[in-house]
Amino acid sequence: MGRIRILPDQVANKIAAGEVVERPASVVKELLENSLDAGATEVRVEVEAGGRRLIRIVDDGFGMLRDDALLAFERHATSKLRDVKDLLSIATLGFRGEALPSIASVSRLLLETRSMEEPTGTRIEIAGGKMLRCEEAALGGGTVITVRDLFYNVPARRKFLRTEPTELAHIASLVTHYSLAHPDKSFRLSTGPTELLGVTPVASMKERVYQVFGSQILDELVEIGVRERDLFLPPPSVPPSQAIAEYRSTEPEDPPFRRFRLTGFFSRPQIQKSNRNSIYIFVNGRLIRDRLVLHALSSAYHNLMPASAYPFALLFLECDAEEVDVNVHPSKTEVRFRHGSFLHDFIRDSIRERLMESRPAPTFSPVPMAAPPAQQGAQLPYSEFSQMLENEQQAASEMAEPAIAGEPAMPEFNLRATAPPTPRLDFSAPPIEVAPGPPPSGKLSRRLDMHGEFPLEAIPAPEMSLSALSDLRPLGQIHESFIIAAGRDGLWIIDQHVAHERILFEQVLKQRAAGRVETQRLLMPMILQLSAEQQIDYARIADELHASGFETEPFGNRTIAVKAAPAAVGPQDLERILFEILEIAENEMRTNSLDDLRRNICASIACRAAIKINMRLDLAKMEWLLRALAATDCPMSCPHGRPIAMHYSTREILKAFHRI
């Protein structure tokens, strides 16, 4: 007897389910696409325990006949394809006929459906790929699919599922994607009694963006409008110039070109995200993740945004179905474009042109030669540093004991503009040629000869220990951004922003560990509107926010009220830092590291509260900054890994001047 045998259908379905059903969000995706293909105008998604215990999809589509409902659980049974030619022009979201049998093989599935062509509906129950019952039922029009105990018979796959909030966030992201792609339909997502997303049909994409993300995000976006570009496709046997001339003269019914159409929204360069989770890409209404489109988007922001940052973007591409191959992977999120190079340039150019059109016109104001007496006390634009210092001074005066023991006392900081800003150096000016002077006198020559060589024994050995920072003596600033300091061995250049960021980071960490984070109450609560994913992240990290000095509470559907914040955070930065922390929480959900989340929250607070570049400091402030930096545990890098100081030893300086 031969060794090769055909696998039973139950085993084959479980193998296929490994590609189609990766996690609960995969089940929601397949069933949601079936609902949209069925012409549903209202889709409701209900989940429990992150989709492990329950996933229910309810739609008002045209439903299925009894025979179709039974046949739908057979492998590769579909109503969307007839022959191989149909693969070249797929217009539906689903087409492979693998979703229902794959889902039914790894769960307990209940299908309830009724077509308006039949007087009664059909109820089918399947567990682990085995049909338990099939009966008639009194049902309304549409389809309800209930999936329970996902992966109950595949323990290995169930073991590798993430936490419930993580799986729920993936489901929320998926439903959010499809609600954006179909603004003319109603979507609802709920987990238990909590509704995470609820949108009604609207007339425009702009209204749907407002429903999903709120006015705060919408105000930061730029609408692309309608961008179109035609790709001319002459017959292979006809030269392009001749084909164009024939087309213009005859205007055939089937023109030899393909039209690409791009609409959507994108953020301005100053709105930066730390990951690609805020990039939504759709092709003919289908959610995709494509490297070609992502590269075109990043190319549009070239030199406008750091390479490590990503924009917020909603891109909707429409093209001929023959221009895109969606039959690449069972998940159908990976596609291939027939003319990828043309599409890449079209997307890049469209976004780049719109970016240039939407940029604000520059304004110039004359720089006063001297500050009038009435403006001597005008506060600098970057006032969060002085505000933070004033808060710390006030809190320190009210407390009987110091906030953190062992830290250097903070001086009386009050950053005020006392003189006009120092003109920036202009390196674009041509060099000044200096005419050669008379040769040095004999006396000067003898002095040069005598000091031309520096004795090596007089050069101290380089001391790279961190204790050398405590002996630094500030000399001044470069561009009011970098502190120049002299030490026992050479010269130091310190980035004042990242140095202060390191100091505040360790202060916030220690205050948080001691349970004594200084907070300030807001005069009026700040109301923030969250997306469905952000609402899940907020519920997961609400306790961490409270421990870090933020007093927040739910305030209606997908909104929170902020009543207090850490004293180091200025009111103007509060909204941005909270959204930044929620974005950090979304990233940390993949690692499930609570300690990393806490450190990243403290790092965000420190970064926003630290002094900025282009801020003048007097010597007293510089001295305090250097002393406080030397007292930190890691004074050579900021919490995000950037270097704080550069060191040029005496030996390196002498060697550069050819003294040794």
From Swiss-Prot:
Q: Which cysteines are joined by disulfide bonds?
A: none
Name the GO terms of the biological process aspect: mismatch repair
Against Gene3D superfamilies, the record matches this protein to: 3.30.230.10, Histidine kinase-like ATPase, C-terminal domain, MutL, C-terminal domain, dimerisation subdomain, MutL, C-terminal domain, regulatory subdomain
Fetch the CDD domains from UniProt. HATPase_MutL-MLH-PMS-like (cd16926), MutL_Trans (cd00782)
InterPro entries in the record: DNA_mismatch_repair_CS, DNA_mismatch_repair_MutL, DNA_mismatch_S5_2-like, HATPase_C_sf, MutL/Mlh/PMS, MutL/Mlh/Pms-like, MutL_C, MutL_C_dimsub
> In the UniProt record, does the keyword Ribonucleoprotein occur?
no
Q: Name one GO cellular component term.
A: mismatch repair complex
Task: Give the keywords, sorted.
Answer: DNA damage, DNA repair
**Molecular functions (GO terms):** ATP binding; ATP hydrolysis activity; ATP-dependent DNA damage sensor activity; mismatched DNA binding
Q: Which Pfam families match?
A: DNA_mis_repair, HATPase_c_3, MutL_C
Role summary = This protein is involved in the repair of mismatches in DNA. It is required for dam-dependent methyl-directed DNA mismatch repair. May act as a 'molecular matchmaker', a protein that promotes the formation of a stable complex between two or more DNA-binding proteins in an ATP-dependent manner without itself being part of a final effector complex.
- Give the family, as the similarity comment puts it: Belongs to the DNA mismatch repair MutL/HexB family.
Q: What is this protein called?
A: DNA mismatch repair protein MutL
Source organism: Solibacter usitatus (strain Ellin6076)
